[in-house]
C-alpha cells in the first residue's frame, strides 16, 4: 500500500490506527514514524508506505494499492506520472481517491468522479466505483439543510459562521 496526501503528515495520520495495531501485533519494529521511511512492514514483507503527493511519490516501487487522501489537492499529473505507473505490473491494482469536493482546480478528483458518473446506467459500468456523500444537485446551497446533506459528520450544535442557526 502506498498512502499519499497533500501533506505527508496527513498521510501518516491515515496510517496511524493501523500502525498502532501493527505495534500491538508485531512489536515496535513493525512501525516507523516520522522519518523518510515512515510506514508499516509486516513479518511477511508486506508494507504500507507513506509519501507526500509529489513527483517522486511511489517512484521505484511496485504497489497493489494507492490510497490518495485529500485527492482534491493532488494534481492529476502526480497520479498519472508517478503513482499510477507503480501499479502497471499488478494484476488487480486499486487506487482509492478520498476527498472533499475541492474546487475548480481539483482536476484528479473531478475527472475520476465524472468518469464514474458518465458510466451510470450503462450496461458496462466501467472499472470505477464511486461512493459519494453529497447533496442533491437541485438543493439550495444557501439552505442549512443542504449543508447537512453534504456532511456525514454534521452536528446541529455547530456554530454556523454565515449567521444561520
Enumerate the language-model features and the residues they cover.
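Hydrophobic/aromatic-lined pockets within catalytic cores
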Residues: 19, 23-26, 72, 84, ...
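Flexible loop/turn segments at secondary-structure boundaries
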Residues: 9-12, 48, 57-58, 74-75, ...
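Residue-level preference for the first positions of well-ordered beta-strands
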Residues: 1-2, 65, 94
Amino acid at each position: 500500500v502506498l498512502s499519499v496526501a497533500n501533506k505527508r503528515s496527513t498521510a501518516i495520520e491515515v496510517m496511524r490506527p493501523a500502525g498502532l495495531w501493527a505495534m500491538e501485533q508485531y512489536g515496535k519494529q513493525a512501525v516507523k514514524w516520522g522519518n523518510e521511511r515512515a510506514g508499516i512492514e509486516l513479518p511477511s514483507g508486506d508494507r504500507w508506505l507513506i509519501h507526500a503527493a509529489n513527483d517522486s511519490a511511489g517512484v521505484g516501487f511496485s504497489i497493489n494499492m494507492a490510497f490518495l487522501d485529500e485527492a482534491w489537492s493532488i494534481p492529476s499529473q502526480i497520479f498519472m506520472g508517478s503513482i499510477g505507473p507503480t501499479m502497471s505490473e499488478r494484476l488487480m491494482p486499486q487506487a482509492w481517491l478520498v476527498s472533499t469536493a475541492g474546487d475548480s482546480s481539483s482536476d484528479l478528483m473531478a475527472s475520476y468522479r465524472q468518469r464514474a458518473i458518465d458510466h451510470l446506467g450503462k450496461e458496462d459500468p466501467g472499472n470505477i466505483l464511486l461512493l459519494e456523500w453529497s447533496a442533491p444537485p437541485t438543493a439550495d446551497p444557501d439552505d442549512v439543510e443542504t449543508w447537512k446533506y453534504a456532511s456525514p459528520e454534521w452536528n446541529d450544535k455547530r456554530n454556523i459562521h454565515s449567521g444561520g442557526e
